[in-house]
Amino acid sequence: MNYNKKSIEDIDVKGKKVLVRCDFNVPLNEGKITDENRLVGALPTIKYLMGKGAKIILCSHMGKPKGEPKKELSLLPVAKRLSEMLNKEVIFADDDNVVGENAKRAVEDMKDGDVVLLQNTRYRKEETKNEEVFSKELASLADVFVNDAFGTAHRAHCSTVGVTNYLKEAACGYLIQKELKFLGNAVEKPERPFVAILGGAKVSDKINVINNLLDKVDTLIIGGGMGYTFLKAQGYTIGNSLVEEDKVEYSKEMIDKAKEKGVNLLLPIDNVVADKFDKDASPVVTEDQNIGEGYMGLDIGPKTAKIYSDAIKSAKTVVWNGPMGVFEFKSFANGTIEVAKAMADSDAVTIIGGGDSAAAVNILGFGDKMTHISTGGGASLEFLEGKELPGIAALNDK
């Protein structure tokens, strides 16, 4: 995939109507936004376009309204909050069909530097099917397209891909530009040693990532629930731990592939286990890889955490996706905490691949110590798999 895409700074936007796909899929509680990170992330692109005298038409999805208007998934709270953040009224075009009379009138009345926000793009069933009729309607409002929603870049929808069939000038905003810079460099030309850490519950979620990264990394660290399938593949007993029986054979193949490629594959050598999946369960540390009958692994053990931390400290590039244990239970959070600490203390380029790892790092207060925290869980995973992301492929090459 070509990561060298035109950015907003490469196109002339003065006086032009610019359709900007943002990711405003934020959590709401009784109409109040409970996490503003995605709004904050969109501000640099919006402010740049305002400063250049563009007419800015923002669009985004929120939640899964499944192709029909749902009041609780309206973007009205986003328009209100953005107005406060930008010190300028963001005009909300409240059309159930997204591109209706309100939107058309609002866009017609725009002056340079004005900002309009369209209604939730997923109010239209065509959006997720990338059907031409809605792509055309969206594109008809604008002269230029800017995509700044990395979180949906792995989806070919009307507002991420379809519009580029009608708007020939298509560039990325600052958020996507940053993602491409850090994730692209990590995958294509990392500073070595390059260490990748994969956690989370399932091998099946990360099959292609493991396979692709074994061609690129110097060290691959595996923790979390998926570690037990690997331990079983090595012939250890895993008690009642989470296991994907149908992935044991695949895990053996990956262990062999690592040897073949000269990749240092690090797997747990001890575990923190309990007799039930419960936040109040008593933690027990195993002496080695084996987990006894009646117990389940819920975190990597202290010896493993030390080995993983040392590997991270000697790296020049680190990518992390997925926690090392049941991070939400205090007794089983230590593995994740130790990995996060090692990354925070490191001078390497440190990249967090969205999702649970990003949440863990932010909860621990290490967010500002990381080089880059990806804004897209699913998109960053597909990026690490080496897949082409449709929402990025559709943008103009530099």
From Swiss-Prot:
Substrate binds at D23, F24, N25, R38, H61, M62, G63, K64, R122, R155. One of its GO terms (biological process) is gluconeogenesis. GO terms for molecular function: ADP binding; ATP binding; phosphoglycerate kinase activity. Its EC number is 2.7.2.3. It catalyses: (2R)-3-phosphoglycerate + ATP = (2R)-3-phospho-glyceroyl phosphate + ADP. Gene3D superfamilies: Phosphoglycerate kinase, N-terminal domain (3.40.50.1260). Disulfide bonds: none annotated. It is found in: Cytoplasm. GO terms for cellular component: cytosol. CDD domains: Phosphoglycerate_kinase (cd00318). It is an enzyme of class 2 (transferase). Keywords: ATP-binding, Cytoplasm, Glycolysis, Kinase, Nucleotide-binding, Transferase. InterPro entries: Phosphoglycerate_kinase, Phosphoglycerate_kinase_CS, Phosphoglycerate_kinase_N, Phosphoglycerate_kinase_sf. Pathway: Carbohydrate degradation; glycolysis; pyruvate from D-glyceraldehyde 3-phosphate: step 2/5. ATP binds at K206, G297, E328, G354, G355, D356, S357. Monomer. Belongs to the phosphoglycerate kinase family. This is Phosphoglycerate kinase. The gene is pgk.
